[in-house]
Amino acid sequence: MANKLRNYTINFGPQHPAAHGVLRMILELEGETIVRADPHIGLLHRGTEKLAETKTYLQALPYMDRLDYVSMMVNEQAYCLAVEKLAGIDVPIRAQYIRVMFAEVTRILNHLMGIGSHAFDIGAMTAILYAFRDREELMDLYEAVSGARMHAAYFRPGGVYRDLPDFMPKYESSKFRNAKVLKQLNESREGTMLDFIDAFCERFPKNIDTLETLLTDNRIWKQRTVGIGVVSPERAMQKGFTGVMLRGSGVEWDVRKTQPYEVYDKMDFDIPVGVNGDCYDRYLCRMEEMRQSVRIIKQCSEWLRVNPGPVITTNHKFAPPKRTEMKTGMEDLIHHFKLFTEGMHVPEGETYTAVEHPKGEFGVYIISDGANKPYRLKIRAPGFAHLQGMDEMAKGHMLADVVAIIGTQDIVFGEVDR
């Protein structure tokens, strides 16, 4: 009697530590080789798009932070640009520079998390410890401007919530830190926020070199990433891949260069592009992107030092007046009250606005019927398209390679499931 071969089906996730959230996949295996990978989405569905349609334009803003909760401010940026486009709001140039600077800070935050956790999933534990050391300082920047380390709600339609602070908060003594450690931690916090940013930009490239020393020529890292999850340029475009997933395959497409927004057309930076379209090339792209982000942050910091000015529109139909004015002027108080109760009214129309998110093209499509709430809000999340490529990328690889492919896609389920 002829032996019958039967494939083996297993559940991967949704509680798997390498699933980057609540990813559940049905994997069909032949021995240890993957025949089919079927991702199941929707476990983190919170109805963000529908919720935003029940809130005013300003109240809907914090929902954006909670989509991709590793790249918070870039989500806000896409939403604010869409509202500004519909309402015809002119954003002060200083606010645009601050936004671009914090968008690049967010890109570094995202890539440090992506590379660190990718290496950790594969088995290299040290990288994530180095990555989180640098992330801590960038989180302090978030906290200094907005009061929150993650969900900042710092970008607002018309500009940003407040100007950059004149000083950086310092660490205080505690039973966990002796005087020597405390002095080291507060060394770069003596001046303004821009001084802190400049000091970070000076030492961070060396920290990227340290990460590269751990991974780039590491034999085990290369064995686990070279030739894994290969996507051709044609298939990457057909699948709707964007960001590093597209550039890693050799397609030079970056919204910051091809369709510049804010002040990116005034910035001098390069777009790293891969050759082989595998996990290793995408890793190299992310490493180089962090270096390019440092270049952009330096240019923004240089400009912001010598160009003071307003950081939010003076049109009080869309942005609140200053607190000092509100306490003395009746009209200002009325504007403030109307904005935070009824909200802004955005003219009828529709717009699709996209930004170069650390994970790819993040787009916001808004239809306005002239009311104080969006009639329809659609979010184009880059991770959603990337996850749909899982079956094609994993087919023919070993079970252990699925973890490497999830890491290289850099998926966060807040934005995939929405």
Swiss-Prot record:
Function: NDH-1 shuttles electrons from NADH, via FMN and iron-sulfur (Fe-S) centers, to quinones in the respiratory chain. The immediate electron acceptor for the enzyme in this species is believed to be ubiquinone. Couples the redox reaction to proton translocation (for every two electrons transferred, four hydrogen ions are translocated across the cytoplasmic membrane), and thus conserves the redox energy in a proton gradient.
TM region(s), chain numbering: none
Membrane topology type: Peripheral membrane protein
Main location: membrane
Similarity comment: Belongs to the complex I 49 kDa subunit family.
Tagged with keyword Translocase: yes
Gene Ontology CC annotation, any one: plasma membrane
Annotated protein name in UniProt: NADH-quinone oxidoreductase subunit D
EC number from the UniProt entry: 7.1.1.-
GO molecular function, one term: NADH:ubiquinone reductase (non-electrogenic) activity
Subcellular location: Cell inner membrane
Assembly mode: NDH-1 is composed of 14 different subunits. Subunits NuoB, C, D, E, F, and G constitute the peripheral sector of the complex.
